[in-house]
């Protein structure tokens, strides 16, 4: 084991000098004597000096402290012992339940599966959320992104998906909280405990109050645990909240590492850093990883480099819209902006495809007619257009749905709607079977049968 000493400290970044014949490799983990702090080597600057990122607070660290090289990258516990536990970026338990007792530790830096090992499937994953199952269906072993600005419901949608999929799906899940609020992490833990699925979930948290090193690596820690389950031949669910904070942590340390900023101040290595993470989140012939990632959209601008870089890696994109949220329609998913590779008649069947496209067509037509209605009023429209507007307002309300995870706030019980019922409901509205029902009957309900019941009471 070689040792060196600290020569410079700039926030989360430190330079350490080693003898020239024993310079650590890039990504090696270093430990500081007498301190509970791990450093990760990022660059070799020459003359035996390496530049490192601290995986924790650098308070009280000074020049001259002795640093030991562990000669291996950061490794974390993997396997079934991690289930039901909360860990930090280094795999240390933070739930006060004693040591993890793992049988195996894996390095958080691993190469992505080769092209020959990868596999894809067309099997659909039912979520029980009408708007998702209809217009942007998820594939088993696929990657999904939830895009949205501040406060439109990314985390709530994510929680509902976890609840519906993790409870219906009997496999294991891994949740990585990357740079989000500790309160949300806490709520999530209690939600999982109350639903009795905590013993099937591994939780890894690196929250917003932590140094950038933790937030930059915590996604890799969670991913490593998911990869272990996948390589054992299981179907794993991998949830990340929030991918944007992973990019942001990279931006925070990028300038300190001496790189020139690129577009909008992001790191020049943005696409590569995103690729390193996303290329590993994939399904192989042994097992699958189905991932759901929340992506914060700065200032509601989807062309910002960070969300724009994420788009290209995904199979389905769910876009949350502030305009829809302001109408009081939750989940605030935009059915015209959200897309999925699975929306193909060969994959989902002709009926589902026709209903989904029919819904989008009616909503798009309503969008075009809005200006005319605003200027001239409804009376100036043709009978056909009036019918389209009425149906599209019903569809818009029928796309809303009470969530299980929001029961405490809304007071109305959550609803899980099967794909069959979803298609039947929207098909009925498009075919005019429910033209006589008032539009309020379609708001915040589950299946179409509830609309008929609700209309009787109105």
UniProtKB/Swiss-Prot annotation:
It catalyses: ATP + H2O + 4 H(+)(in) = ADP + phosphate + 5 H(+)(out). Its main location: membrane. It is found in: Cell inner membrane. The gene is atpD2. Belongs to the ATPase alpha/beta chains family. Keywords: ATP synthesis, ATP-binding, Cell inner membrane, Cell membrane, CF(1), Hydrogen ion transport, Ion transport, Membrane, Nucleotide-binding, Translocase, Transport. It comes from the Bacteria. It is a peripheral membrane protein. Transmembrane segments: none annotated. ATP binds at residues 148-155. It comes from Marinomonas sp. (strain MWYL1). F-type ATPases have 2 components, CF(1) - the catalytic core - and CF(0) - the membrane proton channel. CF(1) has five subunits: alpha(3), beta(3), gamma(1), delta(1), epsilon(1). CF(0) has three main subunits: a(1), b(2) and c(9-12). The alpha and beta chains form an alternating ring which encloses part of the gamma chain. CF(1) is attached to CF(0) by a central stalk formed by the gamma and epsilon chains, while a peripheral stalk is formed by the delta and b chains. GO terms for molecular function: ATP binding; ATP hydrolysis activity; proton-transporting ATP synthase activity, rotational mechanism. This is ATP synthase subunit beta 2. Its EC number is 7.1.2.2. Produces ATP from ADP in the presence of a proton gradient across the membrane. The catalytic sites are hosted primarily by the beta subunits. PROSITE patterns: ATPASE_ALPHA_BETA. CDD domains: ATP-synt_F1_beta_C (cd18110), ATP-synt_F1_beta_N (cd18115), F1-ATPase_beta_CD (cd01133). It holds the Pfam family ATP-synt_ab. One of its GO terms (cellular component) is proton-transporting ATP synthase complex. InterPro entries: AAA+_ATPase, ATP-synt_VA_C, ATP_synth_F1_bsu, ATPase_a/bsu_AS, ATPase_alpha/beta_chains, ATPase_F1/V1/A1_a/bsu_N, ATPase_F1/V1/A1_a/bsu_N_sf, ATPase_F1/V1/A1_a/bsu_nucl-bd.
């Amino acid at each position: 084991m070689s040792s060196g000493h600290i020569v410079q400290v700039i926030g989360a970044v430190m330079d350490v000098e080693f003898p020239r014949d024993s310079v650590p490799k890039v990504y090696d983990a270093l430990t500081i004597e007498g301190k509970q702090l791990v450093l990760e080597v990022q660059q070799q600057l020459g003359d035996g000096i390496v530049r490192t990122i601290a995986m924790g607070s650098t308070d009280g660290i000074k020049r001259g402290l002795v640093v030991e090289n562990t000669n291996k990258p950061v490794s974390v516990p993997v396997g079934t012992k991690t289930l039901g536990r909360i860990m930090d970026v280094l795999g240390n338990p933070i739930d006060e339940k004693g040591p993890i007792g793992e049988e195996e530790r894996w390095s958080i830096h691993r190469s992505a599966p080769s092209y020959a090992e990868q596999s894809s499937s067309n099997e659909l994953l039912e979520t029980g959320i009408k708007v998702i199952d209809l217009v942007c269906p998820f594939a088993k072993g696929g990657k999904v992104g939830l895009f949205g600005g501040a406060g439109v419901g990314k985390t709530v949608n994510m929680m509902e998906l976890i609840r519906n999929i993790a409870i219906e799906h009997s496999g294991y899940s891994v949740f990585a909280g990357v740079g989000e609020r500790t309160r949300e992490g806490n709520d999530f833990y209690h939600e999982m405990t109350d639903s009795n699925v905590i013993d099937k979930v591994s939780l890894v948290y690196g929250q917003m109050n932590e140094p950038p090193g933790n937030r930059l690596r915590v996604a890799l820690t969670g991913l490593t645990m998911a990869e272990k389950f996948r390589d054992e031949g299981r179907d794993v669910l991998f949830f990340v909240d929030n991918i944007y904070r992973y990019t942001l942590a990279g931006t925070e340390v990028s300038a300190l590492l001496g790189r020139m900023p690129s577009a909008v101040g992001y790191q020049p290595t943005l696409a590569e850093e995103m690729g390193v993470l996303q290329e590993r989140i994939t399904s192989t012939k042994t097992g699958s990883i189905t991932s759901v990632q929340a992506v914060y959209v700065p200032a509601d601008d989807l062309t910002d480099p960070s969300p724009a870089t994420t788009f290209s890696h995904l199979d389905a994109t769910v876009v949350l819209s502030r305009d829809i949220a302001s109408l009081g329609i939750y989940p605030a998913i935009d059915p015209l902006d959200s897309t999925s590779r699975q929306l193909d008649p060969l994959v989902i069947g002709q009926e589902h495809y026709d209903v989904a496209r029919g819904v989008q067509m009616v909503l798009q037509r309503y969008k075009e007619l809005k200006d005319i209605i605003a200027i001239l009023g409804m009376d100036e429209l043709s009978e056909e257009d009036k019918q389209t507007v009425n149906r599209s307002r019903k569809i818009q309300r029928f796309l809303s749905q009470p969530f299980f995870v929001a029961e405490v706030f809304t007071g109305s019980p959550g609803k899980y709607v099967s794909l069959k019922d979803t298609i039947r409901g929207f098909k009925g509205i498009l075919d005019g079977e429910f033209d006589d029902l008032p539009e309020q009957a379609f708001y915040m309900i589950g299946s179409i049968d509830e609309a008929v019941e609700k209309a009787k009471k109105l």
